[in-house]
Amino acid sequence: MTEDTKVDLVRSYSSGMPGRALNQARMHHFVLDSPSGPNEALTNSEAFLAGISSCGVTLIERHARDTGVPVTGMEVTIAGRRSRADPTRFQRIDVRFDIRGVDRRQAEALVETWRNR
């Protein structure tokens, strides 16, 4: 690995309960469940989708701030669609951005910045 490479490290451990994993990222610890397990915590797919949508929020807010675009708030909704016959794969992922404080042209440009990252 080169010095210009950033590595994000996450570790997951068995919990002793089928369908539940204990996870660690930096100094943060969290539980992820499988729908076939306890299904009390976020599921793996929900955590995956949250990573994508929260990336949209933080990247767009930072880019708007850095370029002087007056975003006053935003909401990103993401829906992952899977077949009941094969729920291990997403068939489609839809992402909707509601960005406040800007006109449609500015919002579309901000979303395009996210898409290109």
Can you describe what each PLM-predicted range is?
Residues 1-50, 61-117:
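Extended beta-strand/beta-hairpin segments
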Residues 55-56:
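Alpha-helical metal-binding/catalytic segments enriched in His/Glu/Asp
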